[in-house]
């Protein structure tokens, strides 16, 4: 195992703010095993994503901000993000530990300003997200599709601003067609982070899951009896009872909400701990730790 080469208390070294999934992918693809960055989640405002180069790919791990001001990744909880990073310095996510943060400026222009000046410039950038398609009416216009992110360069008129897109093209845009995005400070406190993100929402099912040391649940059995192995969905329906309430992020359309006592028909048991199931016609993913397998043929054994 390579030794970690970063200070987890230096937030500016590993926290990249509202970086999109695609930009994180670009920064980390082909980089050394264990290179990583932490960014704001564009799916659930207030949460974070740990993006890591591992096993010739880039993995993205969701970090949930809990109401008690703690942070959760997989089945592990931490008091703060530096503690989380310290843990994964010596524990594998999937095939790697965290070794070093990705460079904040992977491709600085040759002979241009230094990184400290770039940092100041980046902090002063103003971003907007496009609300509608705009084909452009004149040669000086900047066409865009709904959902793009643009950098504002100049505001020569009240209703028309000059902007640059991700490809570097510059042109005029109609102000009523966009909304401003307020950049959150990378040094701000957890409770004061801005809910906006510069990234386009990414599907929740695209997140990876770190290795877990939590044992898989087993079918409940009578005292003194042998514990039965986890049943297979190939042998017929498997049922579980929700033992913990689950209220998913409103933006996560793949997650299954649970109330304590709900009977879940388990349709698939993924090895990463995210199971698939159905409750009253609603289908989705849920953590196996939120349910307890039971045998509907022997209800007295399930108490």
Curated annotation (Swiss-Prot):
Q: Which GO terms describe its cellular component?
A: cytoplasm; cytosol; extrinsic component of postsynaptic membrane; neuromuscular junction; nucleoplasm; protein-containing complex; synapse
Q: Where is the signal peptide?
A: none
The record's Gene Ontology biological-process terms are: acetylcholine receptor signaling pathway; animal organ morphogenesis; anterior/posterior pattern specification; B cell apoptotic process; blood vessel development; cell chemotaxis; cell migration; cellular response to interleukin-7
Q: Where is this region: Disordered?
A: 184-204
Pfam family example for this protein?
Answer: SH2
Residues in domain SH3? 123-183, 235-296
The GO terms describing molecular function are:
identical protein binding; phosphotyrosine residue binding; receptor tyrosine kinase binding; RNA polymerase II-specific DNA-binding transcription factor binding; signaling adaptor activity
Superkingdom assignment: Eukaryota
Question: In what residue span(s) does the SH2 domain sit?
Answer: 14-102
Tell me if Heme is a UniProt keyword of this record.
no
Give the matching PROSITE patterns. SH2, SH3
Phosphotyrosine found at: 127, 207
Q: What does this protein do?
A: May mediate the transduction of intracellular signals.
Subunit and partners: Interacts with INPP5D/SHIP1. Interacts with DOCK2 and EPOR. Interacts with phosphorylated CBLB and IRS4. Interacts with BCAR1/CAS and NEDD9/HEF1.
Name the family the entry cites: Belongs to the CRK family.
Q: What is this protein called?
A: Crk-like protein
The organism encoding this protein is Rattus norvegicus (Rat)
Q: Which gene encodes it?
A: Crkl
